[in-house]
Structures are given as structure tokens and as C-alpha cells.
């Protein structure tokens, strides 16, 4: 059992401990868009060069608008997504439901990277108040290395969020603080800052739970 997204580290502390939960610090990466005139000001010089090269080499980025584009985006993402980023990847129907239920109210957007009319990358964002959250992103970087599809997908999500007046964009699920995480290193080069939050866990196997409580307390 897991509880997450608790911004206040002290919230529920006593109750969680009494019920044999243990806490692990979890990392998030957040770009503060309201502090700069352009989202790109936070990017590393190498990221800027890669974005310019990708666009110069024929890649285009825009918001998805049709059901077919969303299906093609989901199909592409399923093929390239690494289990190291997110183990439980949703079904392709999930993105169709996202389009039907959320995009109409502008609570989410899907961006696609295209090359010669083929979707080679993209990202999915959700929005709440003044914050944008990058939920999924990926690209066919091995097949289309010169177009930098994964980089363009993240860049455009940040660029669009800034243009629409969001104060922050947060990258979801970038991993444990003590484990090397390729996706976290990738997104940090877009200029975001690491933030540590607390997650509470409890396993059904008592012996394992006791061992982990001792390990993390």
C-alpha cells in the first residue's frame, strides 16, 4: 500500500507509524516558469543546440487534435517507453479516455513530434491551478536520432506551459534519491530543480515490512 504526493512531511506521521508504514523520500523535478521570460532560459546550452538541430532537420511539434493522432501517439509511446521510467504503463485506451474526458475542458494536452507526417515522439501533460505536470513523454530516438524527438517533446511541453501562464511544470515519477535514474538526469538538463517529497509504504508480508521499517527509520 502506498500514499504519495504529501507536500507536508509531517502530515499523518503519527497515524502512518502506528499502522506500521515506513517513509521513503521521493524525488520530483520542477521547472519554475514564472521566474523567467522564456522557458528556454533554464535549459543547458547542449539542450538548446539539440532543439535547434531537431527543428532544422525537419521535425515539427504541435498539439494533437484528432483521435487518430492520439492513437498513433499512444502506439508509439508503448513501443519506446522504458520500464525504468514507469513500470505500470496504461493501455492505449487510456489516452483515448484522456482525450474524451479531459481535453475538452483543457485539463490535459497531448503534444506530438512529427517527421514527414509520421509521429516520432510526444508528451502528455495535465494541468491544475497554476501548475502543469508532464505525465508521459518519449520519442523514437534511435531511429530518428537527428530529429531529437524525445527532447523536442519535453521542450514543447515546457514552452507551451510558459505561453499559457503556468507557474511551474513538474516532471512526475523521476525516482528514488539513492538510485541512478536516466530519465531524471535527462530532464534535469532542461533546468529544473529537484524536490524531495515523502511517500509512505506498507507491505502485506510482515517480515518484509519489519525489515524495511528498520532500514528506513
Please tell me what each predicted stretch does:
Residues 16-38, 166-217:
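Active-site/acyl-donor-binding loops of N-acyltransferases
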Residues 152-168:
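Conserved acyl-CoA
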Residues 1-3, 132, 169:
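Hydrophobic residues within beta-strands of alpha/beta enzymes
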Amino acid at each position: 500500500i502506498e500514499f504519495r504526493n504529501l507536500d507536508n512531511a509531517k502530515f499523518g506521521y503519527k497515524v502512518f507509524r502506528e499502522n506500521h508504514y515506513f517513509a521513503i523520500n521521493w524525488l520530483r523535478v520542477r521547472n519554475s516558469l514564472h521566474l523567467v521570460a522564456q522557458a528556454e532560459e533554464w535549459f543547458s546550452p547542449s539542450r538548446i543546440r539539440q532543439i535547434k538541430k531537431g527543428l532544422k532537420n525537419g521535425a515539427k511539434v504541435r498539439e494533437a487534435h484528432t483521435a487518430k493522432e492520439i492513437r498513433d501517439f499512444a502506439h508509439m509511446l508503448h513501443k519506446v517507453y522504458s520500464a525504468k521510467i514507469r513500470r505500470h504503463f496504461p493501455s492505449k485506451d487510456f489516452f483515448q479516455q484522456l482525450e474524451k474526458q479531459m481535453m475538452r475542458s483543457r485539463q490535459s494536452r497531448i503534444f506530438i513530434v512529427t517527421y514527414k507526417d509520421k509521429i516520432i515522439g510526444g508528451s502528455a501533460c495535465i494541468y491544475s491551478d497554476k501548475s502543469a505536470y508532464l505525465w508521459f513523454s518519449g520519442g523514437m530516438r534511435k531511429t530518428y536520432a537527428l530529429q531529437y524527438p524525445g527532447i523536442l517533446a519535453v521542450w514543447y511541453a515546457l514552452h507551451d506551459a510558459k505561453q499559457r501562464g503556468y507557474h511551474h511544470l513538474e516532471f512526475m515519477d523521476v525516482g528514488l534519491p539513492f538510485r541512478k535514474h536516466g530519465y531524471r538526469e535527462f530532464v534535469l538538463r532542461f533546468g529544473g530543480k529537484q524536490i524531495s517529497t515523502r511517500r509512505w509504504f506498507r507491505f502485506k508480508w510482515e517480515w518484509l515490512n519489519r525489515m524495511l521499517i528498520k532500514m528506513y527509520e
